[in-house]
């Protein structure tokens, strides 16, 4: 019973334990097929190389009857990880060929050693080269890109660039971005990571695109604003004309109303009404004469002109006439 229980526990552990080759594949990244990878080789800034390579593989004894499956599991586990023998990172392979008819067993080791050949597509960038990536993250400190759909690249904000300038680049998720390779890193598991920096061409393109957008918006605003200003001027002219007309109408009304009121007698007696009419006529005649024959009025020392001297002269003439008339009678 104890032996049976131990064997059952071992079988459960073996079933729960993941396969070595499957554990090596990164599930979060999309691996391209060999045909898709070969199509990317000819693209600009790909840094991909397609070439055949020979590899040494230690095959487990359990794969003696299915050698191709064992070889594929080992090669799949090495994808997207830096390989010193390949001097790069393999992303796809095809056309596996076993070199030699027999394998080798060394000493008391249970693995069978084989040499194989396969066509690999290798990603081998170097510092200073230019890459093309798809933006998948934009933050205030860096930009994240995905190269060939499977390699992460981080582009930090330059130290000499201000936060406002960094925001004016207008880089959005999904945009294609060119950058220069600054450094290549890999962690303890061999996961490949790229450190990059913005290239001068990408900065110039972004700045030119931003300047063109700004120029277009300014032109559109000017075109939209100019007819509005003309309308405002027309409205102002119409308003001024309306105000002038209203002012003239008000002036006419004010000129008419006092005349009508002055012509109406204020007294209740009829005699007063008839007495006031000749006085008004005399006043009108005097005004008419003064308008035709201007008289220079006397002025005081202060410069104020008055009719008081004229009245005095008239009184003197009347008194002299009255004084001479009784003498003549005598």
UniProtKB/Swiss-Prot annotation:
Residues 251-330 are annotated as: Disordered. Pfam families: RPA43_OB, SHS2_Rpb7-N. GO terms for biological process: cellular response to leukemia inhibitory factor; DNA-templated transcription initiation. CDD domains: RNAP_I_Rpa43_N (cd04328). Widely expressed. The modification Phosphoserine is found at residues 306, 318, 325. Residues 317-330 have a biased composition (Basic and acidic residues). It is found in: Nucleus, Nucleolus. One of its GO terms (cellular component) is RNA polymerase I complex. Gene3D superfamilies: 2.40.50.1060, RNA polymerase Rpb7-like, N-terminal domain. Keywords: DNA-directed RNA polymerase, Nucleus, Phosphoprotein, Transcription. InterPro entries: RNA_pol_Rpb7-like_N_sf (IPR036898), RNAP_I_Rpa43_N (IPR041901), RPA43_OB (IPR041178), Rpb7-like (IPR045113), Rpb7-like_N (IPR005576). PANTHER family: DNA-DIRECTED RNA POLYMERASE I SUBUNIT RPA43, DNA-DIRECTED RNA POLYMERASE II, III. Component of RNA polymerase I (Pol I), a DNA-dependent RNA polymerase which synthesizes ribosomal RNA precursors using the four ribonucleoside triphosphates as substrates. Through its association with RRN3/TIF-IA may be involved in recruitment of Pol I to rDNA promoters. Belongs to the eukaryotic RPA43 RNA polymerase subunit family. Component of the RNA polymerase I (Pol I) complex consisting of 13 subunits: a ten-subunit catalytic core composed of POLR1A/RPA1, POLR1B/RPA2, POLR1C/RPAC1, POLR1D/RPAC2, POLR1H/RPA12, POLR2E/RPABC1, POLR2F/RPABC2, POLR2H/RPABC3, POLR2K/RPABC4 and POLR2L/RPABC5; a mobile stalk subunit POLR1F/RPA43 protruding from the core and additional subunits homologous to general transcription factors POLR1E/RPA49 and POLR1G/RPA34. Interacts with RRN3/TIF-IA. Interacts with RRN3/TIF-IA. This is DNA-directed RNA polymerase I subunit RPA43. The lineage of its organism: Eukaryota, Metazoa, Chordata, Craniata, Vertebrata. The gene is Polr1f.
């Amino acid at each position: 019973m104890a032996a049976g229980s131990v064997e059952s526990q071992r079988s459960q552990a073996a079933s729960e334990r993941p396969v070595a080759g499957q554990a090596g594949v990164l599930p979060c990244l999309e691996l391209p097929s060999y045909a898709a990878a070969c199509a990317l080789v000819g693209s600009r800034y790909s840094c991909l190389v397609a070439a055949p390579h020979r590899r040494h593989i230690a095959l487990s004894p359990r794969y003696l009857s299915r050698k191709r499956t064992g070889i594929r599991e080992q090669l799949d586990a090495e994808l997207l990880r830096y390989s010193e023998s390949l001097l790069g990172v393999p992303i796809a392979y095809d056309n596996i060929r076993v070199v030699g008819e027999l394998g080798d067993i060394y000493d008391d080791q249970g693995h069978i050693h084989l040499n194989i050949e396969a066509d690999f597509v290798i990603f081998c960038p170097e510092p200073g080269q230019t890459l093309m990536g798809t933006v998948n993250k934009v933050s205030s400190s860096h930009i994240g890109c995905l190269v060939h759909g499977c390699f992460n690249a981080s582009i930090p904000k330059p130290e000499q660039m201000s936060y406002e300038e960094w925001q004016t680049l207008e880089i959005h998720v999904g945009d294609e971005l060119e950058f220069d390779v600054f450094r290549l890193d890999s962690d303890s598991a061999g996961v490949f990571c790229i450190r990059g920096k913005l290239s001068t061409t990408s900065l110039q393109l972004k700045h030119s695109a931003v300047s063109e957008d700004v120029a277009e918006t300014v032109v559109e605003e000017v075109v939209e604003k100019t007819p509005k200003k003309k309308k405002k001027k027309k409205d102002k002219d119409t308003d001024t004309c309306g105000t002038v007309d209203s002012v003239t109408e008000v002036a006419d009304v004010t000129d008419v109303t006092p005349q009508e009121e002055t012509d109406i007698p204020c007294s209740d007696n009829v005699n007063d009404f008839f007495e006031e009419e000749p006085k008004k006529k005399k006043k009108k005649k005097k005004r008419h004469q003064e308008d035709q024959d201007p008289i220079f009025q006397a002025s005081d020392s202060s410069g104020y002109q008055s009719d008081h001297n004229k009245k005095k002269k008239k009184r003197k003439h009347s008194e002299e006439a009255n004084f001479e008339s009784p003498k003549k009678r005598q």
